Each structure stands twice: as structure tokens, then as C-alpha cells.
A protein has these predicted regions:
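N-terminal intrinsically disordered, low-complexity, charge/repeat-rich segments that act as generic
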Residues: 1-46, 58
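A short, compositionally biased
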Residues: 2-3, 70-73, 98-102
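Ordered hydrophobic segments in well-structured contexts
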Residues: 6-8, 27-31, 76, 103-105, ...
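A structural detector for beta-sheet-dominated domains
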Residues: 10-12, 31-35, 71, 78-80, ...
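Broad, structure-driven detector of short, well-ordered beta-strand segments within folded domains
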Residues: 28-32, 64-70, 116
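Short beta-strand/loop turn elements enriched in aromatics
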Residues: 49-89
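Short, compact, well-ordered microdomains
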Residues: 78-124
């Protein structure tokens, strides 16, 4: 069975949200259970969910630490402290290949829907 992968997401171009060129200083670092195709592996997540972490970074906010969670078919980022914000669902995350150059959409805790680029995916 394949282990965890460190995936770094960086804010992609989001002109309607005020980021016409994206922002490499805004994103997420995820320890994710990926299969050989680069997709999330729910069975591996169940075995290693305590190690499946998320860290949100932003130039104007404190970092937020939490976990990658699965509820039904929906993957989301869950934060354990109120000041870090509510859970953030990720649109069809289970269907995406998390490989460099791919894009995913995150509904952030403030309701903004933003596109992020997979900048890095390294087995750990």
C-alpha cells in the first residue's frame, strides 16, 4: 500500500476575488493518502487519518492547522480551534488527481470559493 504524500496548494489565478495573478504565499500544505493515480485513497485515510493534516497559510492571517476529513463522499479541511475558522469543503476533491499543475476549488470558511494550483506532491 502506498503511504502519505505532502501536497502543496498555492492560490491560482482568481481575478474576480482580487487575485489576477494568484499568490504563492497563500495556500495549503496537506499530508494526503494518495493512490498510484494521485487520487485520495479513502481506505488508506481510514488507517492513517491522524497523520492526514492540513495547514493553511496566508500572508495576512495566522496559519491554521487541522485535518483532512471525509464525510460520505465529501473531503474537507477541518480545523479544531474556533479562531481558525469553520470546516472548508473541497469541490470534488476525491475525483481530482493531486499532481503538480492540476487545479482544485476550495470553499473557504468565509464563503469565498477559490481555485488553487497543485504546486508540489512528494511522497513522505
Amino acid at each position: 500500500m502506498i503511504g502519505l504524500t505532502r501536497v502543496i496548494l498555492r492560490l491560482g489565478r482568481n481575478p474576480d476575488a482580487g487575485f489576477p495573478d494568484g499568490d504563492d504565499n497563500y495556500g495549503y500544505v496537506i499530508q494526503a493518502p494518495l493512490d498510484a493515480d494521485g487520487r485520495l485513497d479513502a481506505a488508506l485515510w481510514r488507517e492513517k487519518k491522524a497523520q492526514c493534516t492540513v495547514r493553511r497559510f496566508h500572508p495576512r492571517e495566522a496559519a491554521a492547522d487541522g485535518w483532512l476529513r471525509l464525510r460520505g463522499e465529501t473531503w474537507y479541511f477541518w480545523y479544531d480551534e474556533e479562531d481558525e475558522g469553520p470546516a472548508e469543503p473541497v469541490f470534488k476533491l476525491g475525483a481530482h488527481e493531486l499532481r503538480p499543475g492540476e487545479y482544485i476549488t476550495v470553499r473557504e470558511g468565509d464563503g469565498d470559493i477559490l481555485t488553487f494550483r497543485v504546486a508540489e506532491a512528494v511522497r513522505i
